[in-house]
Amino acid sequence: MKNTILILFTAFIALLGFFGMSAEALADPKADPLAGPNPDADPEAINLKAIAALAKKLLG
């Protein structure tokens, strides 16, 4: 019984991951999958360079 639940749970998580990645690909079809987030496609994307600059400024 535990094995069946584990297999079903794993399959469910795999499907969520697959459809989640498909939704990202549809939202920005010309994006490079190895590149970071495209700020033009996602206006709420995290700006890592700005965060790094702020941390460097705060920490000296």
UniProtKB/Swiss-Prot annotation:
Residues with the modification Leucine amide, per the entry, are 59
The Gene Ontology terms for molecular function here are: toxin activity
What keywords are assigned to this protein?
Answer: Amidation, Antibiotic, Antimicrobial, G-protein coupled receptor impairing toxin, Immunity, Innate immunity, Mast cell degranulation, Membrane, Repeat, Secreted, Signal, Target cell membrane, Target membrane, Toxin
The AXPX repeat boundaries are 27-30, 31-34, 35-38, 41-44
Any remaining note in the record? The primary structure of this mature peptide is identical to that of Mastoparan-VT1 from Vespa tropica (AC P0DQZ4), and mastoparan-like peptide 12c from Vespa magnifica (AC A0SPI0).
| Protein purpose | Antimicrobial and mast cell degranulating peptide. Has broad spectrum antibacterial activity against both Gram-positive (S.aureus MIC=32-64 ug/ml, S.xylosus MIC=2 ug/ml, and S.alactolyticus MIC=16 ug/ml) and Gram-negative bacteria (C.koseri MIC=4 ug/ml, E.coli MIC=8 ug/ml, K.pneumoniae MIC=48 ug/ml, P.aerugiosa MIC=128 ug/ml, S.choleraesuis MIC=32 ug/ml, S.typhimurium MIC=32 ug/ml, and V.parahamelytics MIC=64 ug/ml). Affects membrane permeability of E.coli. Shows hemolytic activities on sheep, chicken and human erythrocytes.
UniProt protein name: Mastoparan-M
* Source species of the chain: Vespa mandarinia (Asian giant hornet)
